[in-house]
């Protein structure tokens, strides 16, 4: 009957709601019609009622609450009916609860029916209401369990679950001997668990005095323990449990598992007191994830790790928990360890014997819980990761007895003859002969010349060489034997042992700048010093710590693992600009797979670019070069002050910068022997060229090195105008640049003829011959002089360095001819002492041709825009991933593996200081024929050497050109009635003679011979 009435009421409520809805619609329709009539609009333009009617949130909310209430009571009624029906069917003879047995004053059913019907009905009503309330409580708990909800904490339920103290049977621990570290860790863990249990008991019983906790029942004799009654620990525990009480008072609820046992409310099972007391800790462990069951703590978080992999895993967990605190699950053990920071070390300075962790006596297990409680089966074991106590005594091994070293019997040196101790004066000419052998023997000639020859003479006595002793007493080689074409000079101290290690023959041959004359020694005093440069600058904030390197290594492994490429970072090197991480691919992983992920890895790591080094010399791993967050400034003075630059003997030493580890990088242009520099605009190419020029100015005097500078941009190299090292003014016109290169070719031919006449193989040998003759007071005449009766004497020839700042512009002006001149210089100019430094910002195949690349093996690539440009310069990729601002790849001669170098910065202020300093010591000695295209008189017999025999019609062709003042191949061809090839050879011969200029960009040539001389 009740349900019928409830359903009728619900239907009436729905009908009332619909009626109110219809009334509202009619009212709204009436208002809209009135408004439209006022506006004069048509009725057909009215919107639809259902689409335009305003919403009534109050009606919807009322309807929702009414339906929800009806469904709830309907569900509760069905559940109660099913419960009562199943209870009566399954347990027909259920005993009467004890509470109803004590009702002596309640009349029976028969008495009440016969005597007083009203009393019986009231008793039955009270009993039914009590049963319904009890069933409602049961259904609420069941509904909460099914819906995975929380119910408020009821202390009476917890007290009912607690058994008496007599039911708890203590377990005696079994002790065994363990190490000090294990004892410290086990003692801490056991003490914390015991403390937790005792304080929970005291908290629930409202006790003020907390009993003391012992670590074990039977401790070892003489064991010194810091007990839990220590004042410091007591204050810590008081603060901890005050905070814990507030947490319990604010939110005290249980978490239930989704499983529910259907039992009678009066059927309870035995539960251990520890489980009921520790239930709040399990509740907090499962509360973070919003689940009903309490998760067991993560054992891996408490383990003590020592290897690299475990350390990296721990770092990852820490970083994830710091970044996402809302997603991390905080276990009960972690919460307790945070609340008790002072109680981590409770052991003294003695060995402790404690039960191991496998025999833990504090294992707590709940088997079953009645009346809808959870079924737990977990271990509440607290593990705290702590090292051994810092003040614990460690048993040291016995000291190793010291064994006295046996005495070594060293025989005394043999006596030295008096002949080697007497003062000796070398004869005349010995100093010059000794100087002539410096470049070949490389002995300590300076010590001999300065008076230190007595020590070396005394050392000869140990070898017993009488022949050398005789030569040291005055029997020297004659000057004819020391200098001549038929025999080679022998150094008198050739067999004397030297304190320095002997140099290789290749180094001696290539070190063309080691020779110095007497005049050079005087001029070298005026070389610039590093005081003209800015001091080195170091930024401590740009260095990376070991922790950052380790974190980056872990990130690299993780990011590559995301792309299914498993690698291992084995080492890292941090430099001023980049950091190289050496990775070892796993078995079966190809290096090309890492190379293909270059851009993806850079994007994943958040850096601008990454350079993958496929092969590292001397190692079996690959390299990943990542840019540093901040880069160091590398000053040029830092490279000049390094031992690598200061101890270099070559006059053509170039300071490049620092490598990836911060070590200075220098190279010798004489061994290069030519250098090709390429890079895009803004990559640091011009600054690198300035650093190279300053390196040679700091090393060589004008008598040793002369320069020809070609600067099409008229900005970079023009600041060197006026220094004494220049052979000609800085060339800014490309027409004159072709003449300068043509002069260099003629100078190369001249030097080759002179070296061939002198019988030497390089410029250093030629200068030695000149020095030897000057030491004897002789002069060697020029064999190719125009005045054979009175030839001019030969002088020392300096090195010539041709610097071209923009090679592409020079190629565009006179491409084919310039390419031929550059190729000839690159092929043959090394032995003649002429070296090239070519720089360009357009590294394309039409500028850097194959003929030029084949003759210039030493190359420097700054940042380029594409892989094609990198292949054009280095014949391999990599330059497109550079960082710019001086970051370069240096390809040394004789190797195919480029070296990454960070170029040194040379400011304009430093360059101006050095230039002004050099201008103080004299004006430059320019050679006029360099830019005019003419030649010196002594080269008239040399200039035609490349053409073999002279053409019989050459004089006629010259006459035709001078008369017509037109140097064209077609004009000579028509005038002399010859073929095109022969006429072209005649014009080229005139160009070599300096009669006509090189062809311009339009092909025209200029007559260089004045009209008066025609």
Curated annotation (Swiss-Prot):
Record InterPro entries: FtsK/SpoIIIE/SftA, FtsK_alpha, FtsK_dom, Ftsk_gamma, P-loop_NTPase, WH-like_DNA-bd_sf, WH_DNA-bd_sf
UniProt topology in membrane: Single-pass membrane protein
Binding site for ATP: 682-687
Residues spanning the membrane: 1-21
UniProt entry tagged with the keyword Secreted: no
Location in or out of the cell: Cell inner membrane
PROSITE patterns tied to this protein: FTSK
GO cellular component: plasma membrane
Pfam families per record: FtsK_alpha (PF17854), FtsK_gamma (PF09397), FtsK_SpoIIIE (PF01580)
Gene Ontology MF term list: ATP binding; DNA binding
Biased composition (Polar residues): 298-307
Superkingdom of this protein's organism: Bacteria
Residue segments, region Disordered: 89-142, 283-318, 487-525
CDD domains in the cross-refs: TrwB_TraG_TraD_VirD4 (cd01127)
Domain FtsK: 662-871
Keywords: ATP-binding, Cell cycle, Cell division, Cell inner membrane, Cell membrane, Chromosome partition, DNA-binding, Membrane, Nucleotide-binding, Transmembrane, Transmembrane helix
Keyword Cell division tagged: yes
An example Gene Ontology biological process: chromosome segregation
Biased composition (Acidic residues): 121-140
Function: Essential cell division protein that coordinates cell division and chromosome segregation. The N-terminus is involved in assembly of the cell-division machinery. The C-terminus functions as a DNA motor that moves dsDNA in an ATP-dependent manner towards the dif recombination site, which is located within the replication terminus region. Translocation stops specifically at Xer-dif sites, where FtsK interacts with the Xer recombinase, allowing activation of chromosome unlinking by recombination. FtsK orienting polar sequences (KOPS) guide the direction of DNA translocation.
Family: Belongs to the FtsK/SpoIIIE/SftA family.
Subunit annotation: Homohexamer. Forms a ring that surrounds DNA.
Domain notes: Consists of an N-terminal domain, which is sufficient for the localization to the septal ring and is required for cell division, followed by a linker domain, and a C-terminal domain, which forms the translocation motor involved in chromosome segregation. The C-terminal domain can be further subdivided into alpha, beta and gamma subdomains. The alpha and beta subdomains multimerise to produce a hexameric ring, contain the nucleotide binding motif and form the DNA pump.
Protein name: DNA translocase FtsK 2
Name of the gene: ftsK2
């Amino acid at each position: 009957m009740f349900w019928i009435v409830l359903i009728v009421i619900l239907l009436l409520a729905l009908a009332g709601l619909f009626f109110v809805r219809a009334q509202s619609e009619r009212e709204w329709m009436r208002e809209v019609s009135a408004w439209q009539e006022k506006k004069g609009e048509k009725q057909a333009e009215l919107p639809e009622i259902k689409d335009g009617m305003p919403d009534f949130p109050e009606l919807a909310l009322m309807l929702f609450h009414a339906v929800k209430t009806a469904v709830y009571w309907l569900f509760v009624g069905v559940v109660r009916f099913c419960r009562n029906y199943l209870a009566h069917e399954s347990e027909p003879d259920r005993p009467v609860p004890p509470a109803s047995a004590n009702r002596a004053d309640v009349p029976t059913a028969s008495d009440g029916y016969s005597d007083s019907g009203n009393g019986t009905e009231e008793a039955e009503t009270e009993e039914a209401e009590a049963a319904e309330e009890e069933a409602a409580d049961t259904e609420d708990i069941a509904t909460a369990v099914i819906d995975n909800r929380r119910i408020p904490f009821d202390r009476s339920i917890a007290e009912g679950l607690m058994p008496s103290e007599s039911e708890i049977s203590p377990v005696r621990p079994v002790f065994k001997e363990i190490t000090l570290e294990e004892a410290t860790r086990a003692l801490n863990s056991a003490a914390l668990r015991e403390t937790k249990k005792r304080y929970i008991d005291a908290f629930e019983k409202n006790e003020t005095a907390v009993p003391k906790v012992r670590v074990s029942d039977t401790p070892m004799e003489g064991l010194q323990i810091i007990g839990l009654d220590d004042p410091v620990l007591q204050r810590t525990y008081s603060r901890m449990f005050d905070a814990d009480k507030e947490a319990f008072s604010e939110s005290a609820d249980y978490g239930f598992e989704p499983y529910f046992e259907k039992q009678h409310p009066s059927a309870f099972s035995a539960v251990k007191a520890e489980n009921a007391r520790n239930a709040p800790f399990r509740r907090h462990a499962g509360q973070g994830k919003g689940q009903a069951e309490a998760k067991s703590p993560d054992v891996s978080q408490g383990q003590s790790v020592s290897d690299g992999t475990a350390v990296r895993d721990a770092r990852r967990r820490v970083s994830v928990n710091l970044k996402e605190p809302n997603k991390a699950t905080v276990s009960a053990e972690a919460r307790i360890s945070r609340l008790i920071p002072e109680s981590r070390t409770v052991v003294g300075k003695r060995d402790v014997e404690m039960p191991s962790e496998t025999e833990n006596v504090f294992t707590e297990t709940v088997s079953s819980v009645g009346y809808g409680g959870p079924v737990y089966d977990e271990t509440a074991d607290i593990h705290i990761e702590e090292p051994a106590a810092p003040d614990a005594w460690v048993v040291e091994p016995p000291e190793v007895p010291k064994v006295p070293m046996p005495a070594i019997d060293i025989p005394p040196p043999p006596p030295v003859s008096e002949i080697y101790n007497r003062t000796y004066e070398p004869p005349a000419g010995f100093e010059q002969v000794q100087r002539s052998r410096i470049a070949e023997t490389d002995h300590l000639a300076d010590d001999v010349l300065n008076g230190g020859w007595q020590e070396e003479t005394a050392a000869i006595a140990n070898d017993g060489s009488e022949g050398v002793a005789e030569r040291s007493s005055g029997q020297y080689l004659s000057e004819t034997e020391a200098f001549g074409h038929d025999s080679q000079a022998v150094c008198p101290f050739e067999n004397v042992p030297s304190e320095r290690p002997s140099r290789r023959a290749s180094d001696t041959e290539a070190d063309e700048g080691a020779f110095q004359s007497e005049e050079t020694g005087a001029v070298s005093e005026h070389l610039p010093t590093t005081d003209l440069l800015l001091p080195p600058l170091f930024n401590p904030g740009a260095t990376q710590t070991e922790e950052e390197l380790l974190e980056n290594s872990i990130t690299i492994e993780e990011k590559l693992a995301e792309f299914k490429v498993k690698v291992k970072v084995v080492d890292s090197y941090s430099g001023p600009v980049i950091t190289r991480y050496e990775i070892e691919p796993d078995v079966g992983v190809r290096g090309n797979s890492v190379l293909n992920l270059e851009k993806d890895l850079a994007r994943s790591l958040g850096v601008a670019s990454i350079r993958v080094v496929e092969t590292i010399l001397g190692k079996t791993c690959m390299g990943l070069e990542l840019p540093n967050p901040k880069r160091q400034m590398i000053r040029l003075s830092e490279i000049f002050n390094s031992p690598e630059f200061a101890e270099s003997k070559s006059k053509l030493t170039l300071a490049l910068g620092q490598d990836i580890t911060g070590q200075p990088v220098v190279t010798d242009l004489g061994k290069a022997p030519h250098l090709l520099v390429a890079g895009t605009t803004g990559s640091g190419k011009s600054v690198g060229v300035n650093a190279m020029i300053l390196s040679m100015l700091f090393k060589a005097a004008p008598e040793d090195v002369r320069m020809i500078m070609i600067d099409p941009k008229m900005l970079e190299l023009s600041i060197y105008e006026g220094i004494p090292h220049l052979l000609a003014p800085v060339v800014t016109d490309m027409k004159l640049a072709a003449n300068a290169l043509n002069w260099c070719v003629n100078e190369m031919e001249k030097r080759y003829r002179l070296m061939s006449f002198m019988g030497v193989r390089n410029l250093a040998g030629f200068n030695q011959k000149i020095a030897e003759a000057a030491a004897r007071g002789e002069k060697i005449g020029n064999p190719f002089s125009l005045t054979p009766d009175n030839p001019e004497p030969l002088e020392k020839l300096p090195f010539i360095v041709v610097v071209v700042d923009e090679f592409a512009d020079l190629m565009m002006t006179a491409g084919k001819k310039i390419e031929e001149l550059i190729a000839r210089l690159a092929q043959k100019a090394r032995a003649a002492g002429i070296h090239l430094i070519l720089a360009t910002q357009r590294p394309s195949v039409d500028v850097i041709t194959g003929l030029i690349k084949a003759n210039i093996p030493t190359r420097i690539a700054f940042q380029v825009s594409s892989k094609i440009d990198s292949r054009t310069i280095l014949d391999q990729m990599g330059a497109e991933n550079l960082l710019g601002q001086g970051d370069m790849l240096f390809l040394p001669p004789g190797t195919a593996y480029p070296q990454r170098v960070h170029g040194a910065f040379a400011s304009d202020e430093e360059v101006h200081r050095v230039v002004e300093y050099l201008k103080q010591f004299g004006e430059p000695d320019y050679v006029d024929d360099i830019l005019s295209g003419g030649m010196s008189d002594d080269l008239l017999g040399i200039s035609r050497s490349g053409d073999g025999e002279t053409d019989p019609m050459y004089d006629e062709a010259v006459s035709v050109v001078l008369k017509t003042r037109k140097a064209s191949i077609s004009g000579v061809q028509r005038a002399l009635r010859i073929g095109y090839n022969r006429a072209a050879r005649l014009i080229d011969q005139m160009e070599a003679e300096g009669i006509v200029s090189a062809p311009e960009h339009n092909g025209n040539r200029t007559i260089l011979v004045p009209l008066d001389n025609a």
